[in-house]
């Protein structure tokens, strides 16, 4: 029966959703125009977003490491550096290169000697410091000049300068997106019922993707992880929305003309898809509560991407269905997705066995996942492929001992305390070396912070003693130390670095006159001292560098960082001291994870349970579904324990949230269908029909999400992103297996619990009556006197006389069947 709603139905009025859907469909040309404008805008604005590649940026603002990093940014200059290794070179050639590199414009210093720290295995390692801060583009120019000069050698460069890592990641993600697009097209062609629906779905995805990327700039700054994987995860997580709408449209279009079918299917899909998206959003909401702010950053990006996917499905896709409707009708084909009655029969036959097996597996998974080896830095994780920068780093690490440096920050003004701290730290085996103003040699065995009398300074600088006394007197006057002027200047002591820089100022002002040789010596010393002061002395704090013999990532290292702070606090009991470095960053990540892990787990379960509670109107069903998915999460993260492969802590938080929020949709599809069918037929038939119905949806969404995860895990050189992809792909496969081969049995034996914990929610009913041809869509109760044309999912109390075209019609027994 192809007809619109009857006149009587029109008289009684349409629902709000139908009115909204009608406006969307009828105004599709305007919507297309606005969408094109927004797409063009987004094509440009997608480049406006600032990408943050430093994970420490997202540390809690009250963490000690974050405060230390902020102080270093404000108070000290960090010059650009690079580790340059030249392989296959003799010691003589290596030594000859050092002065040549120093002569390159922009190179401030080159650290090289003939010890194994700089020459080993026929390779030379030059530690180059540039004359510009690490944020200055001039560093890159100087680095390129160094590379150009050494281009004839076997060269490997390790540096944090520039943004080559992000450029590499962007290129890799672009390649992955091409593969993902191919996978999506293949899966859609396989699972579709008409070829014409594929371009509709693809265009809907593209609109959502581009609009989401084009609005990232509104967030100001996003992490490199969010920038890299959000688009791929958006496609994988939100593909269900367009597919649900498309399937609903095809169902309605069997009875209704194109326009009416789109309107009715949209009005039904909005609440259905909206409810489906709530579980995914609910799982991501948990990350908003993390102290480590990378969680909220990624959660907001993913939630925004899902909202744009909903917007594209509800606003743009109806117009696309109208546009491609004739093509959809002409290109129908048989379904390539097979029926799987054997799975349902197997599940029914094993309903008393598999739940026990699942519980045992879940307990084992929980125990193993509790011992999951987490990494908090890059030292313990790796990607399946290496980019050029990582290969250079690996080559340098293979030939030379890597350095683990920490920066100790203390209040400025007391060189004696700083010297005592460095002396005490130097006694520990865990400390390889230290560097501060108090132990850097300046001239003739004197350290920068050594205090010199006028005579000592005169001998060191080659000044007349009388001239030195004049300079010391001027220094005392400038610093308001008038007691020194009145007393004996001969015993007045001033730190070498302070006096040298003061003399340089006086020479520039003309108060002190020096010979050309003295002036040159002073200028050379001034450059070195200003460099040291800029790096190690600020307005309020001084910085000391500590090089450890310990690895960056280990419990022993983390414990020793506490020991360093304990020693420093002994000398500054009433003042704040700070410690920063890769090891302290990782230690801070570990402490944040201890809290965030509990928060994410609890919040994600509570939010998803709340959504499921009102979806099923039962307290028992949410518990069963969440236990199944939580068991899948435990099993997923038991694999790193079994293989001994470290996983970045952030990957666990992100993937567990996505599993709880997205993979649970597979369980919802099965549970909803089974709840609908179990009262209409034997439980065995109900579970068989349920799996036949749910399999196309699960295999479509699940295969895309899992393949996307595995592609990310295998095709990127960024270890954190690779770990997220691998875990997501593995977790999705586990979830698919469990909802197909364990959840049905749990539903069969837990049906009584679900029924006993059910509750009813008062619903608003609308009285409808009509005569002639009436189109009915929805859950109804009442009497019908006439001939029925269409698809029924109903229980009829009374007499029926039907021609059964497809499906089944069975008389139900009064006693409930097992």
Walk through the language-model features, giving the residues of each.
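Short, hydrophobic beta-strand segments
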Residues: 80-84, 123-132, 368-378, 404-409, ...
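Membrane-embedded transmembrane helical bundles of large multi-pass transporters/channels
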Residues: 1-51, 134-377, 552, 559-562, ...
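Short amphipathic alpha-helices in soluble, non-transmembrane regions
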Residues: 96-104, 138-149, 420-428, 557-568
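Juxtamembrane segments of multi-pass membrane proteins
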Residues: 58-60, 64, 75-81, 89, ...
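Glycine-centered tight turns that cap/initiate beta-strands
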Residues: 103-109, 152, 430-433, 573-576, ...
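Structural signature of multi-pass, alpha-helical inner-membrane proteins
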Residues: 4-9, 13-36, 43-47, 62, ...
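Structural beta->alpha junctions
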Residues: 85-92, 127-135, 158-162, 381-386, ...
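Extracytoplasmic
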Residues: 62-67, 74-75, 87-129, 148, ...
């Amino acid at each position: 029966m192809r007809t619109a709603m009857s006149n009587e139905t029109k008289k009684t009025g349409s629902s709000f959703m139908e009115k909204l859907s009608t406006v969307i469909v009828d105004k599709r040309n305007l919507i297309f125009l606005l969408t094109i404008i927004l797409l063009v805008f987004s094509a440009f604005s997608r480049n406006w977003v600032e990408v943050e590649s430093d994970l420490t940026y997202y540390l809690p603002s009250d963490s000690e490491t974050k405060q230390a990093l902020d102080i270093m940014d404000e108070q000290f200059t960090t010059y650009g550096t690079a580790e340059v290794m030249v392989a296959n070179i003799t010691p003589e050639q290596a030594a000859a290169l050092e002065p040549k590199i120093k002569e390159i414009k922009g190179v401030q210093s080159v650290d090289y000697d003939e010890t194994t720290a700089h020459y080993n295995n026929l390779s030379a390692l030059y530690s180059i410091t540039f004359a510009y801060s690490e944020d200055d583009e001039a560093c890159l120019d100087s680095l390129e000049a160094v590379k150009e000069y050494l281009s004839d050698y076997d060269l490997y460069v390790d540096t944090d300068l520039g943004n080559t890592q992000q450029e590499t990641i962007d290129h890799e993600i672009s390649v992955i997106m091409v593969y993902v697009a191919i996978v999506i097209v293949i899966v859609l062609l396989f699972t579709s019922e008409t070829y014409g629906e594929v371009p509709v779905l693809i265009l809907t995805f593209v609109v959502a993707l581009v609009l989401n990327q084009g609005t990232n700039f509104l967030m100001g700054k996003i992490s490199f992880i969010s920038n890299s994987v959000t688009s791929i995860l958006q496609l994988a997580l939100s593909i269900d929305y367009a597919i649900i709408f498309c399937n609903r449209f095809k169902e309605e279009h069997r009875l209704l003309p194109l326009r009416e079918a789109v309107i009715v299917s949209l009005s039904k899909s909005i609440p259905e898809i909206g409810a489906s998206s709530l579980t995914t959003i609910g799982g991501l909401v948990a990350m908003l509560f993390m102290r480590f702010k990378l969680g909220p950053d990624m959660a907001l990006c993913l939630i925004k991407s899902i909202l744009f996917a909903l917007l594209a499905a509800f606003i743009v896709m109806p117009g696309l269905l109208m546009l491609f409707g004739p093509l959809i009708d002409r290109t129908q084909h048989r379904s390539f997705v097979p029926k799987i009655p054997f799975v349902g029969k197997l599940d029914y036959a094993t309903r008393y066995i598999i739940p026990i097996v699942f519980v045992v597996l879940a307990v084992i998974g929980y125990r193993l996942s509790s011992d999951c080896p987490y990494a908090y830095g890059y030292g313990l994780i790796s990607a399946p492929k290496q980019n050029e920068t990582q290969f250079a780093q690996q080559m340098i690490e293979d030939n030379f001992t890597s350095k683990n440096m920490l920066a100790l920050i203390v209040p400025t003004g007391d060189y004696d305390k700083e010297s005592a701290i460095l002396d005490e730290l130097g006694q520990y085996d865990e400390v390889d070396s230290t560097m501060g103003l108090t132990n850097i040699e300046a001239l003739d065995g004197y350290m920068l912070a050594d205090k010199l009398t006028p005579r000592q300074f005169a001998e060191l600088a080659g000044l007349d003693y009388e001239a030195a006394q004049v300079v010391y007197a001027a220094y005392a006057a400038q610093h308001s130390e008038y007691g020194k002027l009145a007393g004996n200047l001969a015993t007045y002591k001033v730190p070498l670095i302070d006096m040298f820089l003061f003399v340089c100022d006086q020479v520039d002002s003309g108060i002190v006159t020096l010979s050309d040789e003295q002036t040159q010596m002073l200028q050379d010393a001034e450059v070195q001292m200003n460099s040291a002061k800029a790096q190690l002395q600020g307005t309020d704090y001084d910085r000391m560098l500590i090089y450890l013999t310990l690895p960056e990532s280990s419990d022993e290292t983390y414990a020793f960082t506490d020991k360093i702070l304990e020693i420093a606090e002994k000398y500054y009991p009433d003042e704040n001291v700070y410690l920063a470095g890769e090891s302290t960053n990782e230690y801070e990540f570990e402490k944040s994870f201890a809290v965030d892990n509990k928060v994410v787990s609890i919040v994600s379960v509570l939010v998803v349970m709340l959504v499921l509670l009102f979806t099923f109107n039962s307290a028992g069903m949410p518990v069963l579904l969440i236990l199944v998915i939580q068991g899948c999460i435990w099993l997923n993260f038991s694999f790193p324990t079994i293989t001994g492969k470290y996983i970045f802590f952030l990957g666990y938080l992100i993937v567990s949230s996505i599993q709880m929020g997205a993979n649970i949709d597979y369980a919802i599809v099965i549970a909803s269908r089974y709840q609908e069918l179990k009262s209409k037929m034997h439980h065995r038939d109900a579970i068989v029909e349920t799996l036949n119905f749910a399999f196309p949806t699960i295999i479509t969404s699940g295969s895309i999400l899992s393949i996307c995860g595995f592609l990310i895990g295998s095709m990127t050189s960024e270890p954190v992103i690779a770990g997220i992809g691998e875990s997501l792909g593995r977790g999705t496969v586990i979830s698919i297996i469990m909802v197909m081969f364990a959840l049905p049995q749990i539903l069969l034996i837990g049906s009584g619990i679900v029924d006993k914990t059910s509750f009813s929610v008062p619903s608003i009913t609308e009285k409808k009556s009509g005569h002639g041809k009436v189109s009915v869509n929805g859950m109804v109760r009442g009497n019908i006197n006439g001939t029925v044309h269409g698809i029924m999912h109903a229980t009829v109390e009374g007499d029926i006389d039907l021609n059964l075209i497809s499906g089944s019609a069975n008389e139900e027994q009064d006693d409930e069947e097992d």
